[in-house]
């Protein structure tokens, strides 16, 4: 079957028919959500997956909460109008911390969010020092501090907010090399500590894409913890117990918000993740 880039108004070649499968949307502002999708797909390979990324408003980390909520609701609504959804995963820490209540109020399918894996990190740490690596927005939000107070109040939490690491992860998926010097500069506050964190929470879904490089830069033995596997297990449970019967026999598809040259360059990456086509999604506003 041919695989094509598609504009929103361009007809596509029909996918080879298959058995209808529950339709699951994985959404992020960029491509970081692919790390979460990969965990879900590993556990649940036989679903109909849609990946949507907002390359118009990326990155969300510096946007206002009102903007993020309105934007995420608009995009999920547009996808739902094309494909009835059994479940949606907001695979973006920034969007999850602010948009889940609005999404759950509007839609009758389950909506799963991503939160920093502070609870498991607090259990894993040996020296009691946990690093939280996230966007500046996630580091500053009260929700993050509530998680720390609830699950890690006996740990020393060292937080680093970085928008640059999001850009490095996006560049890696575009085929560019990741600068270890840049990572060392970002992580310098920890690397200079007499006793640095022995467990690091990857509090942005982009950051697992940089796991290999992070392990080269951080002290030997540092544990990296993210939410991907837990999100996959939660998705499996909800699909079995609470999701509506929304299925499709279509091939997996990815949506961008603007068909830019940069988005087109992602097609080979998306194909490796199992998405047949990349199409522009028409979004109001």
Swiss-Prot record:
- SUPFAM superfamilies listed in its UniProt record: Aspartate/glutamate racemase
User: Would you say which domain of life the source belongs to?
Assistant: Bacteria
Single GO term (MF): glutamate racemase activity
Kindly give the NCBIfam families that the UniProt entry links to this protein: glut_race, PRK00865.1-1
Swiss-Prot/TrEMBL catalytic activity? L-glutamate = D-glutamate
**What are its GO biological-process terms?**
cell wall organization; peptidoglycan biosynthetic process; regulation of cell shape
Query: What job does the chain carry out?
Result: Provides the (R)-glutamate required for cell wall biosynthesis.
Q: Which family does it belong to?
A: Belongs to the aspartate/glutamate racemases family.
Which lineage is the organism of this entry classified under, starting from the top rank?
A: Bacteria, Pseudomonadati, Pseudomonadota, Gammaproteobacteria, Enterobacterales
Name of the protein in question? Glutamate racemase
| UniProt xrefs under PANTHER family | GLUTAMATE RACEMASE (PTHR21198:SF2)
